[in-house]
From Swiss-Prot:
<keyword id="KW-0963">Cytoplasm</keyword>
<dbReference type="Pfam" id="PF01765">
    <property type="entry name" value="RRF"/>
</dbReference>
<keyword id="KW-0648">Protein biosynthesis</keyword>
<dbReference type="InterPro" id="IPR023584">
    <property type="entry name" value="Ribosome_recyc_fac_dom"/>
</dbReference>
<protein>
    <recommendedName>
        <fullName>Ribosome-recycling factor</fullName>
    </recommendedName>
</protein>
<dbReference type="InterPro" id="IPR002661">
    <property type="entry name" value="Ribosome_recyc_fac"/>
</dbReference>
<comment type="function">
    <text>Responsible for the release of ribosomes from messenger RNA at the termination of protein biosynthesis. May increase the efficiency of translation by recycling ribosomes from one round of translation to another.</text>
</comment>
<dbReference type="GO" id="GO:0002184">
    <property type="term" value="P:cytoplasmic translational termination"/>
</dbReference>
<dbReference type="InterPro" id="IPR036191">
    <property type="entry name" value="RRF_sf"/>
</dbReference>
<dbReference type="GO" id="GO:0043023">
    <property type="term" value="F:ribosomal large subunit binding"/>
</dbReference>
<comment type="similarity">
    <text>Belongs to the RRF family.</text>
</comment>
<dbReference type="GO" id="GO:0005829">
    <property type="term" value="C:cytosol"/>
</dbReference>
Length: 187
């Protein structure tokens, strides 16, 4: 029976990567004073009777470091896109020129930058907690294996493998946080 006990490291790694992917998405939603197409991804527009992502009603471009443009395909949708951006909470005032909506990204003041670094740190902590929860699940699998007759050497091997995977994943979170904080604080 002990031979059949196998810990699914691939599943644990996939779940830890999922936490990292979620962190990257949360980081992308933070406005850093630099224009990026991902800033407007969460914005939903009421189009043709249903809520639609903004990138499905127009082309999103970043022509300059502090400017996002949206070239709306349907002229009748321009007002709705503009309204959706204003109501999205991005804090950006859209400017319209025909079917092109320009979003000038204002520079962030020092206080706002510090607030954003704290928000980024909170997002990173949520990712660390998610990774630790996956680690706990892995350790629980090992305990079940031990109860079912897993040899002590195998138990130590799996515990080390799970811990190394956890350390690597948390290291990736820390690196991503440092990079995001540096990006936010850059003037």
């Amino acid at each position: 029976m002990a031979e059949d006990i196998e810990i699914d490291l691939d599943d644990l790694e996939r779940r830890m990567k999922g936490a990292m992917d979620s962190l990257r998405a949360e980081f992308a939603s933070l406005r850093t004073g630099r224009a990026s197409a991902s800033m407007v991804e969460p914005v939903q527009v009421e189009a043709y009777g249903q809520m639609t992502p903004i990138n499905q009603v127009g082309t999103v471009n970043v022509p300059e470091p502090r400017m996002v443009t949206i070239n709306v395909w349907d002229k009748g949708m321009v007002g709705k896109v503009e309204k959706a951006i204003r109501e999205s909470g991005l804090g950006i005032n859209p400017q319209t020129n025909g079917t092109i909506i320009m979003l000038p990204i204002p520079e962030l003041n020092e206080e706002r930058r510090r607030e954003l670094t704290k928000v980024a740190a909170q997002y990173a902590e949520h990712a660390r907690v998610a990774i630790r929860n996956v680690r706990r699940d892995g350790m629980d699998q090992i305990k079940k294996g031990k109860a079912n007759g897993m040899p002590e050497d195998d138990q130590k091997f799996w515990e080390t493998a799970v811990q190394e995977l956890t350390d690597k994943s948390i290291g990736n979170v820390d690196q991503a946080l440092e990079a995001k904080q540096a990006e936010i604080m850059q003037v």
